């Protein structure tokens, strides 16, 4: 097992190189050409090999062929569109549903402006952003679970 030499940060030539912005790893090895020519291609090829291996070993199922004469009673979108589908399904007016969907990203865009005086990284020291995140997560889960249920049970999740 080889021992790697740590850089001597008291060396004036090394300090001059670092002051000029010469990129080094934490152990003093220059980023060019070592990282860019050796490490990055290995990581890229390894990622590509993992993706190809997963595609070969576990191919995607195509499902049953479409039959236009045998449609399901209620057509549901993909799982990640359940909350949006539930908003459109539960509101009686289509324009109101579209406005409700448009208000979600607008509300998320406004959160940093509401709490711009608080510069902390800790989420417990940013109560507005934390509250908006928790409320949004709960509402999204509620809408997503409700979309899989019939319309009469969707808003109460069948509990009441």
Swiss-Prot record:
Topology of this chain in the membrane: Multi-pass membrane protein
For this chain, one GO molecular function annotation is: electron transporter, transferring electrons within cytochrome b6/f complex of photosystem II activity
Protein's cellular compartments: Cellular thylakoid membrane
Keywords of the record, alphabetical order, are:
Electron transport, Membrane, Photosynthesis, Thylakoid, Transmembrane, Transmembrane helix, Transport
Highest taxon above the source species:
Bacteria
Q: Name one Pfam family in it.
A: Cytochrom_B_C
Does the keyword section mention Thylakoid? yes
Q: Name one GO cellular component term.
A: plasma membrane-derived thylakoid membrane
In terms of InterPro entries, this protein maps to: Cyt_b/b6_C, Cyt_b/b6_C_sf, Cyt_b6/f_cplx_suIV, Cytochrome_b_C_euk/bac
Which ranges does the record mark as transmembrane?
36-56, 95-115, 131-151
**Its GO biological process terms?**
photosynthetic electron transport chain
| Record bears the keyword Thylakoid | yes
**What role does this protein play?**
Component of the cytochrome b6-f complex, which mediates electron transfer between photosystem II (PSII) and photosystem I (PSI), cyclic electron flow around PSI, and state transitions.
| UniProt subunit comment | The 4 large subunits of the cytochrome b6-f complex are cytochrome b6, subunit IV (17 kDa polypeptide, PetD), cytochrome f and the Rieske protein, while the 4 small subunits are PetG, PetL, PetM and PetN. The complex functions as a dimer.
Instruction: Please give the family membership noted in the entry.
Output: Belongs to the cytochrome b family. PetD subfamily.
Known NCBIfam families for this protein?
A: cytb6_f_IV
Name the chain's protein. Answer: Cytochrome b6-f complex subunit 4
Gene name in the database record: petD
């Amino acid at each position: 097992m080889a021992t790697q030499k740590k850089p001597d940060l008291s060396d004036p030539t090394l300090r001059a190189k670092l002051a000029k912005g010469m990129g080094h790893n934490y152990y003093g090895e220059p980023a060019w050409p070592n990282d860019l020519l050796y490490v990055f291609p290995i990581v890229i090829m390894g990622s590509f090999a993992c993706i190809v291996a997963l595609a070969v070993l576990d191919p995607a199922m195509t499902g049953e062929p479409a039959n236009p004469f045998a449609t399901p009673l209620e057509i549901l979108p993909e799982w990640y569109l359940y909350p949006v589908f539930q908003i459109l399904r539960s509101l009686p007016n289509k324009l109101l549903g579209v406005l409700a969907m448009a208000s979600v990203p607008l509300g998320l865009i406004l959160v940093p402006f509401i709490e711009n005086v608080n510069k902390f990284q800790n989420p417990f020291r940013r109560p507005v952003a934390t509250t908006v995140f928790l409320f949004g997560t709960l509402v999204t889960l509620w809408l997503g679970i409700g979309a899989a249920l019939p319309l009469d049970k969707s808003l109460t999740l069948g509990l009441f």
